[in-house]
Amino acid sequence: MNQTTHAVRGESAIAPPNSPISIIGAGIAGAWQALLLAKAGHSVTLYERDNADMREGTTHWGGGMLAPWCEAEVSEPIIMRLGLRALDLWRKELPDTPFNGSLVIAHPRDRADFERFARMTEGHTRLDAAGIAEIEPSLEGRFREGLFYPAEGHVEPRRVLPELHKRIIAAGGSIKFDCEVQPDDCDGLVIDCRGIWARDDATPLRGVKGEMILIETDEVQLSRPIRLMHPRWPLYVIPRADNRFMLGATSIENESSGVSVRSALELLGAAYAVHPAFAEARILDLGSGLRPAFSDNLPKIAISRPANGRNTIAVNGLYRHGFLLAPALAELTLNYVQRGALDNEVMQCK
């Protein structure tokens, strides 16, 4: 899809090259903002309230799926538009990003949901049992049919975020961890990527809890995320390095911390349903994060240009699409900063 059909060209640059830009929040949204702006020649400082491990942030607990076709089942068209552009940016900036596709499977009792998923999405090929076994030998004989989305990808959040931070520094930017700041504390143009921490300035922002479990086993080998149809929400098993797998993810409309017993049972049950060998896997970690979401579950870039005050850009509301959308939203911000271009589906001017 052509992103430029939604753009309105502005009159001039908002921040000239080499001008200071302060970005608050070093999660996936802020990291991509910092990377593209630093590579464009701006003097970027990225502030993060957490330490470099960033266990407090939503990014730490993310799935890292780059799956615009699968997400189209329950998402607005803008998610597909931005997601397709983001895939190109992932390939450009991090060429080693794996694009092995996604596989959707279901048990016979969930066949109606499986067929609905197929109707609601594009970009897939139907596989029979032999086709599933060909691309995922560990699943041989486990499922009779699946939907294969060959152009989708995935990243490992706890590895890719430090890599983005390294590239920001290599591009001339700086990162200050353990440094909690407010927009009024910063120099130059301010880009607010605090996620749920910005709720007081970004109403009606809410937190949607997503829970995950990290397990380890060498009894199962997978090359791509596996989505298992489920009556309440799609559950998935995502392969990670060193024989590890991420199980996710719930989507719960409350902001409590931790993982509930019910959610843990559903996530572990999904893994067992994909392959019984997961029953002997070791549980390494479990936790939850709060996805920042507006009432329509769509991302927004809010631009504030008061007559006498600090210019601020707030990027928020990525909901469950943080890794998918962050690069495209960063590019929209860059286009606005460099030439005043506005995307009228995403950007709001105050």
Feature-to-residue mapping (PLM):
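N-terminal Rossmann-like FAD-binding beta1-loop-alpha1 element of flavoenzymes
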Residues: 21-45
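Short hydrophobic core segments
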Residues: 24, 186-196, 330
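Active-site substrate-recognition segment that forms the wall
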Residues: 35-39, 66, 96-98, 196-310
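Glycine-rich FAD pyrophosphate-binding loop
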Residues: 39-58
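Dinucleotide-binding Rossmann-like beta1-alpha1 core, especially the glycine-rich loop
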Residues: 63-135
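Short beta-strand to alpha-helix junction loop
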Residues: 74-84, 105-110, 147-163, 258-262
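Helical element adjacent to the flavin cofactor pocket in flavoenzyme catalytic cores
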Residues: 147-182, 193
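C-terminal catalytic lobe of FAD-dependent flavoproteins
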Residues: 281-350
